[in-house]
A protein has these predicted regions:
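Helix-centered, glycine/charged polyanion-binding patches within enzymatic domains
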Residues: 229-276
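Polybasic low-complexity intrinsically disordered regions
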Residues: 1-222, 227-235, 245
C-alpha cells in the first residue's frame, strides 16, 4: 500500500522496462497477451446497517462538529449493532430510515465547515453509503432499502475501493482485479494494473498497451472482444487476435432461437437485419 500510494507506484516496472530497453530483449517481438485475475479481499462484505453505523461513527470520531449533532437512531458511542427486532421487517425498515436521517443530519451540519483530507474522505464516504442502498419511503422524511443494487456499490467501509464481481451467474467474488500485459515468447510482463473487481478487462487492457509502439498483435480472450475495445486497438495501430464471445442460447426457450450469426450485418448502411 505504501508503494501504491507513493509518487512513483510503478517504480519497480519502470526499472524492469529500463533493463528491457537497454538489453533489447523484446526487439522484434510484436505480440502481447492480455489477461486478468481476481484478488480476494480480506475484509467482509457489509450490509447497509453496518455500513451506515460504521461511517457515522468514523465521522463523529474525526470531526468534533459531527459529534455535537443530535442523532437518535442509535447510540453510536456503544459497540456492536443497533438493538432491533431483525426478523420484524417494519422494525428493520424504521432503523434503516433513522440511520439515514442521522447521516443526513450530520452531513448537513458539516456543510461549509473546513475539513482536512482525512475528515473529507470520511464525510464523503458517509454521504455515499447513506444514499447507495436506499430510496425515499412512502412517508415524507422516511427511507427504505431500494430494490436494486447500485452499479458501483461500496461493499465495505473498511476498504471502500473493494468491489463485488460476478465471475459467472452463480460464482461471485469481492476484492480487486490484477491486469497484465505479457510478451508470450519470453514471459516478460510489460505492464500491470490493479483495479476494483468490477472494472472491465477490455478498457484496462487498452491502457496497458498505451506506451507500446504501433503494430502489435494483441492476444486475449473474449472479455477483451467488445466493439469499443477492438476499435481502440485498431486506432492505436494494433491487430487483434481475440477469441470471439461464445454464442449462447437460452436453455429455457428451446432450439427456436437466433444467435448473432443469424443476423445480416450491413456495415456500410449500419443496419442489422433479423432473420425472423
Amino acid at each position: 500500500n505504501k508503494l501504491r500510494g507513493s509518487d512513483r507506484p510503478q517504480r519497480i516496472f519502470d526499472a524492469v522496462r529500463a533493463v528491457i530497453d537497454a538489453t533489447g530483449i523484446l526487439k522484434g517481438k510484436r505480440r502481447r497477451a492480455l489477461d486478468s485475475t481476481l484478488l480476494d479481499d480480506a475484509v467482509a462484505t457489509q450490509d447497509t446497517v453496518t455500513q451506515l453505523v460504521s461511517a457515522i461513527r468514523r465521522v463523529r470520531r474525526l470531526v468534533p462538529e459531527a459529534a455535537a449533532v443530535s442523532v437518535t437512531a442509535h447510540d453510536y458511542d456503544a459497540s456492536g449493532k443497533p438493538v432491533c427486532a431483525w426478523d420484524d421487517p417494519d422494525a428493520k425498515a424504521a432503523l434503516v430510515s433513522g440511520l439515514v436521517n442521522d447521516a443526513r443530519a450530520i452531513i448537513d451540519a458539516l456543510d461549509g465547515i473546513e475539513l482536512d483530507d482525512l475528515q473529507g474522505d470520511a464525510v464523503g464516504l458517509l454521504a455515499l453509503v447513506a444514499g447507495q442502498d436506499v430510496e425515499p419511503g412512502d412517508d415524507e422524511g422516511t427511507w427504505r432499502i431500494a430494490q436494486r443494487v447500485a452499479p458501483d456499490r461500496v461493499i465495505s467501509t473498511v476498504d471502500p475501493e473493494s468491489r463485488h464481481m460476478h465471475k459467472s451467474r452463480s460464482v461471485y467474488r469481492d476484492g480487486y482485479k490484477a491486469h497484465v500485459a505479457v510478451e508470450p515468447d519470453t514471459g516478460l510482463i510489460t505492464a500491470t494494473a490493479l483495479t476494483p473487481a468490477n472494472a472491465g478487462d477490455g478498457p484496462t487492457g487498452v491502457e496497458l498497451l498505451a506506451g507500446e509502439e504501433r503494430g502489435l498483435q494483441v492476444l486475449a480472450d473474449s472479455a477483451y472482444g467488445s466493439g469499443p475495445v477492438r476499435s481502440a486497438l485498431a486506432e492505436a495501430g494494433h491487430s487483434a487476435a481475440i477469441k470471439a464471445i461464445p454464442l449462447r442460447r437460452n436453455p429455457k426457450l428451446g432450439s427456436d432461437q437466433f444467435t448473432r450469426d443469424d443476423f445480416v450485418i450491413d456495415h456500410l448502411a449500419r443496419t442489422a437485419t433479423c432473420p425472423g
